[in-house]
Design a protein with these regions (language model features):
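Intrinsic low-complexity, intrinsically disordered coil/linker regions enriched in small/polar
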Residues: 210-293
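Cytoplasm-proximal transmembrane signaling helix
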Residues: 17-21, 292-346, 350
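Extracellular/periplasmic ligand-sensing ectodomains of membrane signal-transduction proteins
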Residues: 82-90, 103-170, 174-182, 234-252
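Juxtamembrane extracytoplasmic/periplasmic/luminal helical "stalk" adjacent to the first N-terminal
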Residues: 6-10, 15-91
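Sensor-regulatory modules in signal-transduction proteins
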Residues: 178, 192-194, 275-277, 287, ...
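HAMP signal relay modules and closely related sensory coiled-coil linkers
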Residues: 334-382, 386-389
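Short regulatory alpha-helical segment in sensory/regulatory domains of signaling proteins that mediates
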Residues: 55, 73, 100-108, 215-221, ...
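Conserved beta-strands of PAS-like sensory domains
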Residues: 181-217, 281-283, 292-301, 305
């Protein structure tokens, strides 16, 4: 038959283990869920803040062009003369040169700046074209592109002029490679219209690396990164994929990303997908120029904090269980020790051994039930000794 000591130890340990297990399990489930949500929120905020930074860069460009546009329209006092007088056009161009030059020099990343006129009533090389090879060099004025050499439908060479004119509003062009200097550029162009008639355009070409360097400097968790696409999933910038390729063509798992880009309700929300066999999560935000900035990371990295927290809770629970076993064992021995001593006294009494044991004296001083039992047993032994005597 099991002793009271064993029963007490087992009871204490079982109760402690059950409570520790239940509390630990609840803590792990809730903490893991909360930690994963925190990782998602961190990723969403990172996506928004990075998008805002890119938008700020674009706004600096658009503000520069819009300032030149406002001055250009204000100085265009006689639109009719602009159509018929070469001298008027030349004078106007000279007035705009220092204004365009100053604006271009003060715009970070600007490589070209231009004011071009409608080739239907001006010379095919009319206007201004400022260019430089990199952001550290000075702008120089060169002869503008000869419109007579290209058909208006030639998007590659003169799309930067005709597309904004056809749109009838300010337009961000998609990034393109300037083969002359081997640099990817992105353009912001505003058409000039007076009384509903197209006069020309004003625009700037910005070194696209100003944007991509910012994206490359971004990191999230261990291997998360950002990239740019347009609304249809065409790659504008990606560290692994070729510019101009489509996400859906790169990996079938990316079709869900393309689908999400066309759904406004998914913007700034977590979108799960697979890429190269890995489960990933992405957030995206639409930029000022219509491009989409995407921030992506492996799902396992979002769950890493959850796993670490679960390990800590599990480790704490395991330590608590071990400590409980030790404390339960010590308490069991402590609680049952006086009972064991009283049991020994009872056995001595049954064998009529009435000799006093100094080791049992402390039992009489106890204030609990064992103390009262010891005193009662002492009195009984005393009476038995008198009877035997």
């Amino acid at each position: 038959m099991k002793s009271i000591k064993t029963k007490i130890i087992v009871t204490v340990i079982l109760c402690s283990l059950v409570s520790t297990f239940i509390c630990g399990a609840i803590s792990i489930v809730n903490s893991v869920s909360t930690s994963y949500e925190d990782s998602q929120q961190e990723m969403q905020l990172k996506c928004v803040s990075q998008s805002d930074e890119l938008d700020t860069m674009m706004q600096n460009v658009s503000q520069s062009v819009e300032m030149v546009y406002s001055i250009a329209v204000a100085k265009l006092e006689h639109a009719a003369s602009f159509r018929t007088s070469k001298d008027y056009v030349d004078t106007y161009t000279k007035q705009m040169l220092p204004i365009l030059m100053q604006s271009a020099q003060n715009t970070k990343g600007a490589l070209t700046a231009y004011i071009r006129y409608n080739p239907e009533f001006t010379e095919p090389t009319s206007g201004l074209f400022l260019t430089r090879d990199n952001s550290d060099s000075e702008f120089e004025s060169v002869t503008p592109t000869d419109f007579s050499m290209y058909d208006p439908s030639d998007v590659e060479h003169v799309g930067w002029y005709y597309i904004p004119v056809q749109n009838g509003k300010e337009t961000w062009m998609e990034p393109y490679l300037n083969s002359n200097i081997g640099v990817y550029m992105i353009s912001y162009v505003i058409p000039i219209e007076v009384d509903g008639e197209s006069i020309g355009i004003i625009g700037m070409d910005i070194d696209f690396s100003e944007f991509t360097d910012t994206i490359d400097s971004l990191s999230i968790f261990d291997s998360g990164y950002g990239f740019l696409v347009n609304e249809s999933g065409k790659v504008m910038y990606h560290k692994d994929l070729e510019i101009g390729s489509n996400l859906a063509d790169a990996d079938s798992g990316l079709q869900s990303v393309v689908d999400a880009l066309g759904n406004e309700q998914t913007e700034e929300t977590a979108v799960s997908y697979t890429y190269q066999g890995k489960d990933k999560v992405m957030y995206y935000k639409t930029l000022e120029n219509g491009m989409k900035f995407l921030l992506t990371a492996p799902k396992t990295e979002l769950q890493e904090k959850s796993r670490q927290l679960a390990k800590q809770i599990f480790g704490g629970a395991a330590f608590a269980m071990i400590l409980t076993i030790i404390i339960g064992t010590v308490l069991g021995f402590t609680i049952t020790k006086p009972i064991t001593q009283i049991d020994g006294i009872v056995k001595q009494t049954a064998e009529f051994e009435f000799a006093s044991n100094p080791a049992n004296q402390h039992l009489y001083k106890r204030k609990d039930e064992t103390g009262r039992m010891a005193i009662s047993l002492h009195n009984m032994r005393k009476n038995l000794r008198q009877m035997v005597a």
